């Protein structure tokens, strides 16, 4: 991501968090929607513009073809010392799309490293092209309330990103992250 766009994104993150002090930063969804949504999050046109960045759209097109629609966005902003964990899951478990011909684009606004809870994934878990069994999570200190029922966490790899880098993953990829302990 170009430096000027990254600076604008950081300013938009700060603004979005400041405008919604009653919502944990990890739960700010729909930032691309300046008209609000069911969670009463009022986003901004700037986020919609970020999501339409031509170089990112071109990468997505290479993976899923030219028929692209942005239907959701999520800000995973994990404050130091108390940022929520994201249990192991597949995006396809949550997404209301059929068929699941979609991807997730992650944009690192700040460094996303193991020490501050970067995304982790299970290599090859997307290859069967199916959603595995998930179970309800009782804990309240997590960003989502379902997790993969059976998993060998020893296979996990970090998806560390530096500010301005992006990562794209498949809807079937098993992934999650720990809380921010930095």
Regions found by a protein language model. Give the residues of each.
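Short, intrinsically disordered, charge-balanced linker/junction segments flanking boundaries
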Residues: 1, 177-182
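A structural signal for well-ordered alpha-helical scaffolds and beta->alpha junctions
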Residues: 53-57, 102, 137, 141
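Short acidic/polar capping segments at secondary-structure boundaries
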Residues: 75-82, 92-93, 100-101, 109-114, ...
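Double-stranded beta-helix
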Residues: 112-178
